[in-house]
Amino acid sequence: MKLEVGMYVRYKPLLSSKYVKINKIKEIEEKENCLHIWLEDKDLITEKYLIKASYNIIDILEEGDYVNNERVEEIWKEIVLVGQECRPISFNNIKSIVTHEQMEQIAYKLDH
């Protein structure tokens, strides 16, 4: 896959392999036979840490991620179905995303 500025990426940050993030490519530099990929939030990654990349953010979502604070139940080509009612959300209506790995990392778990 050829990476280009403006693509969305699902990746593991260099400093933490405990969770997965989603961001957008801001700049790409080739240095010593290695691509350095700068993201909008100032993260720097290499291809080794990429999981998926696409111009359509829906392509890199996974079931269990959270879109607009609701759990993704199903993913179709142009929409995601979220929440218990499986409401459709299109690309243009996506405002925020939390990956299921991020949610697992930050969740407070009760021992009963």
Feature names for model-found ranges:
Residues 1-112:
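Structural boundary micro-motifs
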